[in-house]
Amino acid sequence: MDGIGDGTESMGFDMPMLMNQQPHLFGSYGHDGSPVAPIFSNPTFQDEPSIGAADDNSDAKRRRIARACDMCRKKKIKCDGKMPKCSHCTNYKTDCVFTQVEKKRNPPKGAKYIEGLENRLGRMESLLRLSGLLSEDDGGKTDLGTLEKRLADRYHASGSNTPHNPQKINIPSQSQIAMSQQNSSSHYSTPRLESQSSPRTAATSPESQKESETEVEGLSDMMCSLVTNNCGETRYIGSSSGFSIFSPKGIQWVNEKTGDNSFQEMISSAYVDDNKWMYWKPEIFSDIFARRVFKPLPPKDEAMSLFKDFFDNFNCMFPLYHEPTFMHLVERQYSRDPYEGSGWWASINVVLAIAHRLRVMSNLVPQEEDRKAWLYLKNAMGVLTELTMRNTDLLSVQALLGMSLFLQGTPNPQPSFFLVAAAIRLSHSIGLHKRGSGFGLNPVEVEQRKRVFWIAYLLDKDICLRSGRPPVQDDDDMNVELPSDDPPDNIGNVPLSDGRSKFNLFRSMCRFATIESKVYKRLYSAKASKQSDGELLNTIGELDKELEDWKDSIPLDFRPEHEIKASHTPLILHVVVLHFAYYNCLTTIHRMSVHHGYWTSRLSNYAIQGLNARPLNPRVFLSAVLCVTAARASINLIKYIPQGDFACVWLILYYPVSALVTLFANILQNPSDARARSDVKLMNVVVNFLSTLVSDESNGSIKRMLGLCGEFERIAKVVLDKAEKESYSKKKRKSPEEPVNLQQSTPEEHPAPSPSTTQPTQAPSRNVPMSSPLFAENPGDPGGNTMADDAGGFASSREIPGTTGVSTNIPPNIQAMPGIAQDYQDMLSPDPLEGVSFADQPPYSATANTPLSSFQQPFVPQDLWQMPMTIEWDWADMSTNFPVFDTNGPPHGGL
């Protein structure tokens, strides 16, 4: 111990006690986090008696201490701390006792954050030293500008074809960094491709990051293989497969190791004669794979006319086939050497079926011509087993998608579900979901593969959102770019009203499908159900913003919430379906907020108290109003549907029927809504639309759907009549001499909301009515324009002469949130929907005789959203007996 004391005194207290001890990041704190004075940086040696006795000239005076002795402390006098007794204890002959009181203090706020920053900086400096950008003895002398210059020089040097400088060391991978930290004397240099997967430091420029990502994706493509045989069929093998050695990168590696191309030549020759499963189990499957012809192909002239109709009116918007390639195979089909592939046989029959249906839809031929379409589809369905069990070519994928598109116009949705799933699975077999930069395809092939994949993708996501079933394609495992915005063949482009501009509608539909996919994945998947309140609200706001950005990118001629400016019937149908899908997606996003009952005190407290980490999209507070408005707009689109087109009706019937359910729910919850009567008229529009479709006795599904929708309309009328009677009875019970005016209300009865109150304003819910109205025509006038209902706690607005439309008063809980009130007011204005005309709807204005509900925004109850919202085409499985209407229409009248 004496040696230790002597060593300590000779070194002084400015030196560390242990030479092999790592330097502390925080010199003012002990190992347990408690603060320690600098002189007591190592308390082990400070209580050592030899330290105090080491100096012979010392007067035996104690070291300076933090506490006085107990007696001096009690008398509140200065203690000199002499040994063995202080002066006062010696004079008064008392015991000099020092009671050690351990005093712990927590580290100051932010200590752990600073510690984390220092740790990260230390690791970053270590990485820079390992990369050669910093020298070992730099000591923090290199400034940031010098580092950036060195990094730029290193980046340009690595991008050139010159050999690497052996003195410069590439940034190692994580495992090598860990090894180098354990053994600082060794350095590891890695190949260039390996260094691309290393963690990027803060000094990496955005350009180098983008370049690295591109090279990594290129390497991933090289690890995939697309093998084509002499029949034109392909087989895709992904990088995760154990057979990825047959990929271009794997073959290149084998060639480099062996020094010759024998392996590559053997693989190529093996695949040339590969017919895969053409002759698999012929004794069992020969009769199944036999091709049955239910209707022979038409003569060439008639077929050419049908093909022209298909490519001019359908394929121009849904580019399922490449026209030059298809017509080449058509010429071969009507020659002496037709192509015998089952994928081509199914494709030509599907095109004929769709072409016949287009003619029937445009009223160019009688309705009986639709039977020909079904017979050609039957030809294609005859080889369905062969398409799914044998084939792996693009024509087979196209044929499956064509069948699915045809069958979407039928009451039974199950075939479309199955065919789309089979098409996507088959597209994986030929690598359509991958960019294919290393497949050696020409630009025309690449573009057509992209188009076919995106058609399958948008069908998959549309089915997913409407049926609530998970999608087939995983968004995390695809890297196909969107179709070209302005392709050379002009596919997908539609002219605008100005006569000069054009817009690619197909690409916009593909972008919309990606939003639909995000809506399901982030709001309705099993993983999404585990989100917190804040995460869910932010997700709703982000998805709503993305959807609105997409809508704003569409020209006004075709933009939702505006009148459709198109004269070509097939084009109108495409645009109408897109508008229906937009309103359905908007409702699906905001239905999650209503579904969870977020217009309750829980949401109000959460939002007003600022518990969300990011500012919320103000439209999340209008979820119910947006759902109901979208339902009204959807029903208004019925006027664009061609009359008598059953295929088209089944394609879009889901949307108006689900909109009717939304309006029905809103009327049940809000019977005193100012637009309730006009909403009943809109429900009647749907009922009358369905009643025009029951002329065909075979359409039992239409009758069941009509019966249910007619019952919804009847119940809504009963609820409205009851609400009006109750309102009239309340007003009749009031004394006419007793004016009701808010000016007579005392501040105690109606306290003004204040953002500074400790208890936030109670948000409205189904059971908690607000004492102040949402809509008032004059927000600045505290009296005269608003009437309070003393009995029920509801409030109503009085109409100001000359004003119509949505009133713009802001609820207190929104007004208390800075920056949101104006956005809220703007969204309540009718301008965003001025282009949407609602048939037979009066202006939205509240009168003194119309009592408004609590919070007055349409509120769809949670209970009804718990209904199965997958009102699909076929209701044949519903066990409840609904009333069946005859062909004369429902009791409410017809169109």
Curated annotation (Swiss-Prot):
List the Gene3D superfamilies hit by this protein, alphabetically.
Zn(2)-C6 fungal-type DNA-binding domain
For whether the record's keyword set contains Zinc, the answer is yes
**Polar residues compositional bias: what residue ranges?**
158-207
List the CDD domains hit by this protein, alphabetically: fungal_TF_MHR (cd12148), GAL4 (cd00067)
* Keywords, sorted A to Z: DNA-binding, Membrane, Metal-binding, Nucleus, Transcription, Transcription regulation, Transmembrane, Transmembrane helix, Virulence, Zinc
In Gene Ontology terms, what is a biological process of this protein? Answer: DNA-templated transcription
Instruction: List the biased-composition ranges (Low complexity).
Output: 755-765
Spell out the GO cellular component terms annotated for this protein, sorted alphabetically and separated by semicolons. membrane; nucleus
Locations listed in the record: Nucleus; Membrane
Ranges for region Disordered: 156-218, 726-813
Outline the subunit composition: Interacts with ncaA.
Q: Tell me which residues form the DNA-binding region.
A: 69-96
A molecular-function term among this protein's GO annotations: zinc ion binding
User: Species name for this entry?
Assistant: Aspergillus fumigatus (strain ATCC MYA-4609 / CBS 101355 / FGSC A1100 / Af293)
Q: Which Pfam families did the record assign? A: Fungal_trans, Zn_clus
**Could you tell me the membrane topology recorded for this protein?**
Single-pass membrane protein
Q: What is this protein called?
A: ABC-transporter-regulating transcription factor
Q: What does this protein do?
A: Transcription factor that regulates expression of the genes related to ergosterol biosynthesis, including erg3B, erg24A, erg25A, as well as cyp51A that encodes a target protein of azoles. In coordination with ffmA and ncaA, is responsible for the expression of the ABC transporter abcC/cdr1B/abcG1 related to azole resistance. Directly binds both the cyp51A and abcC/cdr1B/abcG1 promoters at a conserved 34 bp region called the atrR response element (ATRE).
Q: Which residues cross the membrane?
A: 648-668
